[in-house]
Amino acid sequence: MSWQAYVDDHLMCEIDGNHLTAAAIVGHDGSVWAQSPNFPQYKPEEITGIMKDFDEPGSLAPTGLFLGGTKYMVIQGEPGVVIRGKKGTGGICVKKTGLSLILGIYDEPMTPGQCNMIVERLGDYLIEQGC
């Protein structure tokens, strides 16, 4: 299965009539493996900041998580495994695998729990596959 198919079929899937606003799979170096058409253009330093928080949990909390110039307030996650952020009625979930970052961005009516489930389920599967 191609990386794009993982985004199209597993991240942008419908759940209870809702779907993510945008999603992507990127390498730890920030290179895009696959993304939805409306995924925001991000800066390399934004991915560097996310990777740093996985290595040093809590490093993003004082400044927030930035992606595509949008600032998300960092909320509870799993240190070193999942980062979750909130902005208004939406937010972001980032799951780290051995080789990649799985990113999901949502807005109402999708709930944070639905976004987390979609992103983390694919991330867990890719970890099991050694990716």
Curated annotation (Swiss-Prot):
Record has Cytoplasm as a keyword: yes
UniProt cross-references to SMART domains, sorted A to Z: PROF (SM00392)
Keyword set includes S-adenosyl-L-methionine: no
GO cellular component, one term: cell cortex
PROSITE patterns recorded: PROFILIN (PS00414)
Chief place where the protein resides: cytoplasm
UniProt GO MF annotations: actin monomer binding
Protein purpose: Binds to actin and affects the structure of the cytoskeleton. At high concentrations, profilin prevents the polymerization of actin, whereas it enhances it at low concentrations. By binding to PIP2, it inhibits the formation of IP3 and DG.
Assigned protein family: Belongs to the profilin family.
The protein's name: Profilin LP04
